[in-house]
Amino acid sequence: MCIRDSVGTGENGRIKRQDIENLITSENINSKTSSTPDTPKKNETSKPKDKDKSISRLRKRIAENMVLSKQTSAHVMTSVEVDYENVEIFRSKLKTKFKEENGFSLTYLPFISLATIYALSEFPTVNSSFDLENGTHDIHSHINLGVAVDLNQEGLLVGTIPEADSLNLKGLARKISETSKKLREGKFGLEEVTGSTFTISNNGSFNSFMTAPIINQPNVAILSTESVKKRPVVIQSQDGTDSIAIRHTGILSLTWDHRVFDGSIALLFLNYIKDKLENSDWLQGLE
């Protein structure tokens, strides 16, 4: 600050007290302004850009089928909880030997599939196709089981196991393994991905709790398997007393077409599967 540079406002240019105070104030403002660094401009080129990705033919087909199904069927979801302890005890005893002898794992899916086939035989309306425009409702004589297969997160295909009702537990396990392998490797024919009469989506393999799957047209229902976990449950002993036990449990979710049947059939169907899983003697299925 230089007082000599100040212009006095008093008589004959004399510097007054107010002139000095004004000069001090002016210097402080200039000092603050000069000491404040310029804010650097944001580098616009460093921002990540959106990626334009073309839709694959498979994804486009999946999208079309999903929208068509939601526009066609009256989707309703019903679920039950299953105690898998009966399955787990049997599976844990045999899974190591089974894989050594057959070259693939004995998972929960073949057990669920076989129980589902039993239920479809008992409730044939669930194993059908429905065409409202033409006024037809076809009850299928055979069970062609569709199994949804994830293609390593690149899409989804439904592999078909024709006449699955003619197979036992071991035969189903083998067919499911072979079909899944073919689809993932892209080594399949058209007949292996068409013609299903009922579909199972194995979401449990991805650690799901509950899923509402979309019906695979022209089926009238689809079953979603959910993850099997150890959970505390209340069990009743033979003398009628209750106790807490750790059991392998999981949810089964059925999405069904309310145009074709009602909730009573959906629940009877699901509880039939539940009963088979909880009480069947699985040993005969491997013979």
State where each predicted segment sits.
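Conserved small/polar residues in nucleotide/adenosyl-binding loops
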Residues: M1-D5
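C-terminal catalytic/motor cores of large multi-domain enzyme assemblies
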Residues: E11-D19, L23, E27-E287
